[in-house]
Each structure stands twice: as structure tokens, then as C-alpha cells.
From Swiss-Prot:
One Gene Ontology MF term: oxidoreductase activity
Residues binding heme b: S48, K62, H66, R96, T100, H101
Gene this protein is translated from: HB1
Coiled-coil ranges (or none): none
A Pfam family that the UniProt record links to this protein: Globin
KW Transmembrane (keyword) present: no
Organism phylogeny: Eukaryota, Viridiplantae, Streptophyta, Embryophyta, Tracheophyta
Assembly and binders: Homodimer.
Originating species: Glycine max (Soybean)
Main subcellular localisation: cytoplasm
UniProt record similarity statement: Belongs to the plant globin family.
Site (Homodimerization): K135
Protein name: Anaerobic nitrite reductase Hb1
Function of the molecule: Phytoglobin that reduces nitrite to nitric oxide (NO) under anoxic conditions (e.g. during flooding or in waterlogged soil) and upon root nodulation. Required for general plant development and during nodulation, especially for the onset of symbiosis. Monitors nitric oxide (NO) levels during early phase of the nitrogen-fixing symbiosis and buffers oxygen in functioning nodules. May not function as an oxygen storage or transport protein. Has an unusually high affinity for O(2) through a hexacoordinate heme iron because of a very low dissociation constant. Involved in water stress tolerance.
Catalytic activity, reaction form: Fe(III)-heme b-[protein] + nitric oxide + H2O = Fe(II)-heme b-[protein] + nitrite + 2 H(+)
Length: 157
């Protein structure tokens, strides 16, 4: 997935905000997932470890590590976008992500939910840095990662 349209200014905004958020990535990852489920409660059914869970989200033993991994991967991918010229998630991981999302029944519109949740999480995490330009930078980075995952959303071989 080409890093077209991701400018030096956007890269600087993403890097600056990610450097600030990195130290709280576990907490922010959990916030990110809680926002996804607030926006789209039905999305809970897409996660095998949440589907039939009766414990509160914060107490689900599998949610924290998953949420942190997803948040970190999303942010790290955004930071590398301009330098690499494309989404840098390893191809094998991208294929696995695509297949997993496909198998779970994730639809294209679900990525709009993750974008809203990501933007809200970042806005709350670094309010003093937040600006329309930063919002645009993170939107662009999210959209390129989402497109890369969607392009691999097919049955696994």
C-alpha cells in the first residue's frame, strides 16, 4: 500500500504524538477498544474472546494484550508510513490480519468505526497537540493501513 499523500508535516505530527502516547500504550489501547465498542456495541461479537464473555471489559484477560498490540501496531505503522513509502506491517502479518478480519466477518464499514475510535483516543491522549492537521495526519495513516488490511481480506489459503 503506497504512502502517497503522507507528507513530511503529517509524519512529524504522527511521530510527535506517538512519542508522547507510547508510554501509555496499554491504557490507550484499552481506551481505543472501549471506544470501538461504545460506537458499535455489536462489534463485540467479532472478537472470539469477547463474544460470550461475562466479565467487564477491563477484567477480560485477553482484551488488554490484544488492545495494546493493535494500538501499537497501528501507531507504529503510521510512524513508518512516509519513510517506507507504504504500510510496513510485514506481508505475512498483513495476510494473517486480512484473513483473520475476513473470517471474523469484519466489513469495510467497521474500519470507519476504528478510525473514529482511534481519533478520539489520540485527541484525548494528547489534547495540547491536537489540531485539524494532526487529525488529518492520523486519518490518512489509518486509512492506508485499513486499505492494506482490506486488500488481504479473503479466505486464507
Amino acid at each position: 500500500m503506497e504512502g502517497k499523500g503522507f507528507t513530511e508535516e503529517q509524519e512529524a505530527l504522527v511521530v510527535k504524538s506517538w512519542n508522547e502516547m507510547k508510554k501509555n500504550s496499554q491504557e490507550l489501547g484499552l481506551k481505543f477498544f472501549k471506544k470501538i465498542l461504545e460506537i458499535a456495541p455489536a462489534a463485540q461479537q467479532l472478537f472470539s474472546f469477547l463474544k460470550d464473555s461475562t466479565v467487564p471489559l477491563e477484567e477480560n484477560p485477553k482484551l488488554k494484550p490484544h488492545a495494546m498490540a493493535v494500538f501499537v501496531m497501528t501507531c507504529e505503522s503510521a510512524v513508518q508510513l512516509r519513510k517506507a513509502g507504504k504500510v510496513t506491517v510485514r506481508e505475512s502479518n498483513l495476510k494473517r490480519l486480512g484473513a483473520t478480519h475476513f473470517k471474523a466477518g469484519v466489513a469495510a464499514e467497521h474500519f470507519e468505526v476504528t478510525k473514529l475510535a482511534l481519533l478520539e483516543t489520540i485527541k484525548e491522549a494528547v489534547p495540547e497537540m491536537w489540531s485539524p492537521a494532526m487529525k488529518n495526519a492520523w486519518e490518512e495513516a489509518h486509512d492506508q493501513l485499513a486499505e492494506a488490511i482490506k486488500s488481504e481480506m479473503k479466505p486464507s489459503d
